[in-house]
Amino acid sequence: MPKVLVLYYSSYGHIETMAEAVAEGARAAGAEADVKRVPELVPEPVAKAHFFKLDQGAPIATPEDLVNYDAIIIGAPTRFGRLPAQMANFWDMTGGLWLKGALIGKVGAAFTSTAVQHGGQETTLYSLLTNLIHHGMVVAGLPYSFAGQMNMNEITGGSPYGATTIANGDGSRAVSANEQEGAKFLGRHVAEIAQKLNA
């Protein structure tokens, strides 16, 4: 049974919701899946003033946790078309793991959220995946076998580079059913690949 880590950062809860869906998909494929988050860097008074969701239940991850998993799926919202400082800071602390080649051969994937459809989803996914590639991980996307990517009946996230959601500029749009299905598919897909690689 592969062990999957879903590692995320979420300001307003959209990525937290996606992370839980990713983990659900991995578990459906027979994997053991843990959900952890990276530390918040924004001072608490500022975070509260901007209505950040600070009551997230997932434990805080450390870089050392990464070696315990066969697959690592990372998620974070966009910040001007790239990963946010919180996730970048976490990966900046993994230099020791990189020196040892500790993550080489593990499966990796990514998911993100943006305010609007054209708010930098794929560039953010690229910036998340770059960390995994530099660590020598085997990167998986969200294949078109997930039929929801071809959904033209609603505004929806989804990219061959990873699962995505659209939050609206004020964060008022909830993660849609189709987007949650995409996240579950990604988790299941990664778990199945990890299972094959570890067979």
Curated annotation (Swiss-Prot):
UniProt key word Cytoplasm: no
Keywords: Flavoprotein, FMN, NAD, NADP, Nucleotide-binding, Oxidoreductase
Domain annotation Flavodoxin-like: ranges: 4-190
Family in the record: Belongs to the WrbA family.
Enzyme Commission numbers on file: 1.6.5.2
Cross-referenced PROSITE patterns: FLAVODOXIN_LIKE
Catalytic activity of the protein: a quinone + NADH + H(+) = a quinol + NAD(+); a quinone + NADPH + H(+) = a quinol + NADP(+)
Protein name per UniProt: NAD(P)H dehydrogenase (quinone)
Required cofactor names: FMN
GO MF term set: flavin adenine dinucleotide binding; FMN binding; NAD binding; NADH:ubiquinone reductase (non-electrogenic) activity; NADP binding; NADPH dehydrogenase (quinone) activity
Protein residues bound to substrate: W98
Residues that hold NAD(+) according to the record: Y12
The record's free-text note on cofactor binding: Binds 1 FMN per monomer.
A Pfam family hit: FMN_red
GO CC terms of this entry: membrane
Transmembrane segment boundaries: none
Residues that hold FMN according to the record: S10, S11, Y12, G13, H14, I15, T78, R79, F80, H134
HAMAP family: NQOR
